[in-house]
UniProtKB/Swiss-Prot annotation:
Protein name, per record: DNA replication and repair protein RecF
UniProt KW keywords: ATP-binding, Cytoplasm, DNA damage, DNA repair, DNA replication, DNA-binding, Nucleotide-binding, SOS response
UniProt main location, coarse: cytoplasm
CC terms in the record's Gene Ontology section: cytoplasm
A molecular-function term among this protein's GO annotations: single-stranded DNA binding
Source species: Protochlamydia amoebophila (strain UWE25)
KW DNA damage (keyword) present: yes
Family matches, as HAMAP family: RecF (MF_00365)
SUPFAM superfamilies: P-loop containing nucleoside triphosphate hydrolases
Amino acids binding ATP: 30-37
Origin: domain of life: Bacteria
Length: 359
C-alpha cells in the first residue's frame, strides 16, 4: 500500500497541515520540538486508532481547541481510498471511504504498518507488558478474531478480578469459562507468531548488526507450544481452580496470557543483562523488520508502512548504514531526523519535509 497524502487539523502543535508523500522515502527533518514525531503520531493514529505516545485523545488536541481531525488518502491493491479520524470532547468518529466504523477493531489492518521509536529499546529492557503489546498489535492487524478474543478476555479478567476482591464465588465460574476460551486462542496465536518471527528476526539481526550471534525468541506461558486450543483451555481451567483461594486473598488473577512474556536472548544470554545498547537496539530493529515481513506475508502481498522516529539514535555508523540499506526493500518509509542530508547517498525516490512549515 502507499500513503499518498495526510491532512491534520488542530493535532498537537499543528493548526493545519497537508502533506503529499513519496511512494518510497519520506524524510521529515528539522530541530527538536517542531513536530516531526507528531506527523508519525498522526499516521499511527490512522493505523491502529491511537498514538504511540499516549492513549488519551485529549492530549492530542491543539491547545485552546476542542477537537482534532486527520484524513489520509492512500492506495491499497491499486485502489485509492480515504480514511478520516476525528475526536471532539468525548466523541470519536472514524470514516473509511464513506462508511462510519463503529469500533477501533474495524480500523485495524486498513493501513498496516510498523514504527520504531527511541523508547523501543524498552521492548527488550522493560516490562513484559511491552512485549505482550508488541505481539498483540501485530497480530491484531491481520487477525480480527484475535481482537475479538483480546477484548473478550480483558472484559472477563476485569470481572473475575472484581469478584475476587469482593470474595464472591457465586458467578465466578461463568467468567472463568469465558476467560479460558479466549485465553487459549490468544496463547496459541502468540506461539504461532513467535515461531514465524524467530527465523526472520535472526536473519535481520545479522543483517542489521553484522554479528553472527544467535538471536532467540521464547514465549513463556503456563501452556506449551505443542498443545491444542482445547488442551490449553483445560490447563487454564485447572490452574484457575488451583489458585482461586490464594487469588481471593490478593484480589487478582495470577496466571493467563496477561501474565505471559516474550524472552529474548543473544547467544543464549538474556539480552536485558548481557547485551550492549547497540546490540539491544539492533535486536529491537530486527524484531520490527520481522514484524513488517509478517504483516506483508499475511496482508495479501501488500507492503505495510515503515516508520522510524529519530533514525540512527544511539547507533554507530556501521549499524546506521546497515539499517538504511534494509529500508530500501520495505516499500514506503517515513523517517524523522535533525539531519537533512541523511538520505543524500540513497538513490531512490525521496521527498524531504523541512520543519517548521505550519505557521
Amino acid at each position: 500500500m502507499t500513503l499518498r497524502s495526510l491532512y491534520l487539523q488542530h493535532f498537537r502543535n499543528y493548526e493545519e497541515a497537508y502533506l503529499e508523500f513519496s511512494p518510497q522515502f519520506n524524510l521529515i527533518c528539522g530541530p527538536n520540538a517542531k513536530g516531526k514525531t507528531t506527523l508519525l503520531e498522526a499516521i499511527h493514529c490512522l493505523m491502529i486508532g491511537r498514538s504511540f505516545r499516549t492513549s488519551h485523545y485529549p492530549d492530542l488536541i491543539q491547545q485552546q481547541f476542542e477537537s482534532f481531525f486527520l484524513e489520509a488518502q492512500f492506495y491499497k491493491h491499486g485502489i485509492e481510498q480515504t480514511l478520516k479520524f476525528g475526536f471532539h470532547t468525548t466523541d470519536r468518529k472514524i470514516i473509511y471511504n464513506s462508511t462510519p466504523l463503529a469500533t477501533l477493531s474495524n480500523l485495524l489492518g486498513l493501513i498496516p504498518g510498523v514504527i520504531i521509536t527511541p523508547d523501543d529499546v524498552q521492548l527488550v529492557k522493560g516490562s513484559p507488558q511491552l512485549r505482550r503489546q508488541f505481539l498483540d498489535i501485530q497480530i491484531a492487524q491481520v487477525d480480527p478474531l484475535y481482537v475479538h478474543h483480546l477484548n473478550r478476555y480483558g472484559r472477563a479478567l476485569k470481572q473475575r478480578n472484581h469478584l475476587l476482591k469482593m470474595k464472591q464465588q457465586i458467578s465466578i465460574d461463568s467468567w472463568e469459562q469465558e476467560m479460558t476460551h479466549s485465553a487459549a486462542y490468544l496463547i496459541q496465536q502468540r506461539y504461532q507468531t513467535i515461531t514465524h518471527l524467530q527465523n526472520l528476526a535472526q536473519k535481520y539481526y545479522h543483517l542489521l548488526s553484522g554479528e553472527n550471534d544467535l538471536l532467540t525468541l521464547e514465549y513463556r506461558s503456563i501452556a506449551n507450544s505443542n498443545l491444542s486450543i482445547d488442551e490449553i483451555k483445560k490447563l487454564l481451567v485447572k490452574q484457575l481452580c488451583k489458585n482461586r483461594q490464594r487469588e481471593m486473598q490478593i484480589g487478582y488473577t495470577l496466571s493467563g496470557p496477561h501474565k505471559d512474556d516474550l524472552f529474548v536472548a543473544i547467544g543464549g544470554r538474556d539480552i536485558r543483562y548481557f547485551a550492549s545498547e547497540g546490540q539491544q537496539r539492533s535486536c529491537v530493529n530486527a524484531l520490527h523488520f520481522a514484524e513488517w515481513n509478517r504483516l506483508h506475508q499475511r496482508g495479501d502481498g501488500d507492503f505495510p508502512l515503515f516508520m522510524i522516529d529519530d533514525i540512527g539514535m544511539s547507533l554507530d555508523s556501521n549499524r546506521k548504514d546497515r539499517l538504511v540499506e534494509q529500508l530500501q526493500s520495505v516499500g514506503q518509509v517515513f523517517l524523522t531526523t535533525t539531519d537533512p542530508k541523511f538520505l543524500d547517498h540513497i538513490d531512490a525516490d525521496k521527498k524531504i519535509f523541512t520543519l517548521p512549515f505550519y505557521n
